[in-house]
């Protein structure tokens, strides 16, 4: 018998535990200095109670208690804080500022069972205050906390969901089409956004064009005005003035070089109503933290209050800090690494890479080689179904696979472009 931990769980030995303790102390002291008070929420929640607050990540552990209630181990803390405020603090004037450091439990993506299913979430929630000042406060606090956690030099990508929601509402789109567009934005699947807003779009062309263009807008403070020019003729500037003011406040706080306005940022949680933001580090392929404004969520449980907050993964922040300690020169010298599929997709893939100007020597007949190294690029030869996992886990910078493999993997990757080859013929035998 192998005496091992369950998949997605691990032991933490003394050296790492001491580092976690130090980070927790420094970050919590930072939050406390801003007036945030500690809270704790239960590990288990009634499933229907969590669902009432909006879409959430899946919990890997669900079971019935003796009363017949379906319970789940918490996948997120924000929903619990909203429930607590609406029930335990009903009638109290506020505002409230809360901080926490708690374990959360997430389902592994697709077949990636080695992925962590237990992680430590550090965050704050500012309850009862609205407007740019409160939004800037939580963004600034996240930047400061990540610095203290060792994830220095992170970039914060900001947007506001109000513009997209206003475009969808004004377009006259059906509820089904609106849900499809929102799902594509939440998944950062802009190939799907392009398809939905193409020639057969279910909305007037001017709205389809605006929705299609929105996630391509990114940059500094000037990007806000680019969005305004896009949506003002359609009367869809919802939340843009507040967002612009928030960006100005962050610049005044000295964060101008850390902030990126990026309207492709739309959280996978559907409960956000205003500003949304994500923290990125060059050492990590996925966001290490995110947050935003969720003014409607507390009202789902009772008394409505405006609210904003953020959370980040302690483990991911530590991974960024460890990666940053490695030689910058070694990382800069590493070539682009692409996961290339074997089999029927190989010939078209080689042609596409050649058209992009890459050296594909040896790629058309790799034999038993697993890695082909050419000037400026490395090719990792994989099964088509494995390409998403290689990218998600950092073994490749990008990859090529079929749409079916991408959907089946359910990995945290972004579909950049449809290469328009490899379509399969489906046969039904009767």
Each model region followed by its residue ranges:
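Acidic, His- and aromatic-enriched active-site or binding-groove loops in soluble protein domains
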Residues: 59-68, 173-193
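A ligand-binding cleft/hinge motif common to bilobed small-molecule-binding domains
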Residues: 388-389, 400-412
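Positively charged, Gly/Ser-enriched RNA/tRNA-binding surfaces
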Residues: 16-34, 45-48, 78-92, 97-152, ...
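N-terminal hydrophobic or amphipathic helices and topogenic motifs
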Residues: 332-393, 414-417
């Amino acid at each position: 018998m192998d005496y091992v931990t369950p998949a997605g769980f691990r032991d933490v030995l003394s050296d790492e535990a001491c580092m976690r303790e130090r980070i927790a102390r420094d970050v919590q002291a930072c939050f406390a200095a801003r007036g945030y008070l500690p809270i704790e929420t239960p590990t288990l929640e009634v499933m229907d109670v969590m669902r009432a607050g909006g879409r959430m990540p899946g919990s890997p552990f669900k079971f019935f208690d003796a009363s017949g209630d379906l319970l789940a181990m918490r996948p997120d803390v924000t929903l619990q804080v909203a429930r607590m405020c609406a029930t335990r603090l009903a009638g109290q004037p506020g505002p409230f500022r809360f901080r926490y450091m708690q374990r959360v439990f997430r389902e592994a993506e697709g077949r990636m069972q080695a992925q962590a299913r237990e992680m430590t979430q550090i965050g704050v929630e500012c309850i009862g205050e609205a407007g740019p000042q409160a939004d800037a406060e939580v963004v600034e606090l996240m930047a400061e906390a990540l610095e203290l956690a060792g994830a220095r030099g992170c970039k914060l990508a900001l947007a506001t969901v109000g513009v997209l929601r206003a475009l969808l509402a004004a377009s006259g789109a059906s509820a089904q089409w609106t849900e499809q567009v929102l799902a594509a934005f939440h998944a950062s699947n802009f190939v799907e956004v392009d398809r939905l807003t193409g020639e057969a779009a279910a909305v007037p062309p001017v709205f389809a064009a605006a929705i299609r263009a929105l996630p391509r807008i990114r940059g500094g403070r000037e990007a806000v005005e680019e969005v305004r020019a896009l949506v003002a003729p359609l009367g869809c500037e919802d939340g843009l003035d507040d967002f612009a003011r928030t960006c100005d406040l962050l610049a005044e706080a000295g964060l101008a070089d850390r902030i990126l306005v990026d309207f492709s940022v739309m959280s996978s949680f559907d409960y956000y109503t205003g500003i949304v933001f994500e923290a990125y580090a060059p050492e990590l392929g996925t966001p290490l933290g995110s947050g935003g404004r969720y003014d409607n969520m507390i009202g789902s449980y009772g008394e409505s209050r405006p609210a904003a907050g953020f959370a980040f993964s302690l483990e991911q922040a530590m991974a960024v800090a460890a990666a940053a300690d490695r030689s910058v020169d070694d990382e800069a010298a590493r070539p682009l690494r692409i996961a290339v599929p074997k089999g029927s997709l190989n010939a078209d893939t080689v042609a596409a890479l050649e058209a992009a100007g890459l050296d594909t020597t040896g790629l058309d007949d790799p034999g038993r080689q697993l890695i082909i190294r050419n000037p400026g690029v490395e090719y990792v030869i994989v099964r088509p179904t494995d390409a998403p996992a290689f990218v998600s886990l950092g073994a490749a910078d990008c990859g090529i696979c079929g749409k079916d493999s991408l959907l089946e993997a359910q990995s945290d990757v972004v579909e950049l472009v449809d290469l328009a080859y490899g379509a399969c013929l489906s046969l039904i035998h009767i």
